[in-house]
């Protein structure tokens, strides 16, 4: 809306904090969207072999080469996110190297964790009512069916963004 500042950033380093950089300090609403690591690897292996023509071995070499950065720069960002959406498959993903298919949203659950739910006025009873088959796993976390992730994002983020933009 006119007279407001809204910047949307999507990428790996939106909340990165190092000795030289502190991106997190500049962000008003930090949202993490991350699959569990085996699902992340399955997605990468599938994409890089089927769409980019790499061999399984080349993709695994890339994953292993990037592991230090993943552990030291990517993962630590999630401790400062306000809301995390983590997709968790409910099918066997124990060996991502041999997985033939990427689990579908309907073969997944999404764990949504709020760092400080009171700060954003999260209405858990409303979310539980609106998102069929959802439940609370902790006082600040709700679990929703994978196919309802878009609905959950809309129900959670729309009121937060309206409030932030002064509407």
Each model region followed by its residue ranges:
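Short His-Asn-centered micro-motif
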Residues: 9-12, 33-34, 87
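Phosphate-binding/switch loop-helix module in NTP-utilizing enzymes
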Residues: 1-18
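C-terminal accessory "lid"/substrate-recognition subdomains
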Residues: 2, 6, 23, 37-167
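Inter-motif core of Ras-like GTPase G domains
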Residues: 22-34
């Amino acid at each position: 809306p006119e007279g407001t500042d809204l910047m949307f950033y999507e990428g790996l380093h939106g909340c990165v904090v190092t000795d030289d950089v502190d991106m997190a300090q500049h962000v008003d609403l930090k949202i993490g969207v991350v699959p569990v690591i085996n699902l992340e690897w399955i997605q990468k292996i599938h994409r890089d072999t089927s769409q980019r023509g790499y061999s399984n071995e080349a993709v695994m070499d890339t994953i292993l080469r990037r592991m230090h950065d993943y552990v030291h720069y990517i993962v630590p960002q999630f401790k400062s996110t306000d809301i995390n959406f983590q997709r968790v498959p409910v099918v066997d993903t124990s060996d991502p190297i041999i997985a033939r298919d990427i689990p579908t949203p309907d073969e997944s659950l999404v764990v949504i964790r709020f760092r400080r739910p009171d700060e954003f006025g999260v209405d858990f009873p409303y979310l539980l009512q609106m998102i069929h088959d959802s439940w609370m796993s902790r006082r600040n976390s709700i679990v929703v069916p994978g196919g309802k992730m878009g609905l959950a994002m809309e129900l959670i983020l729309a009121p937060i963004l309206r409030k932030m933009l002064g509407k």
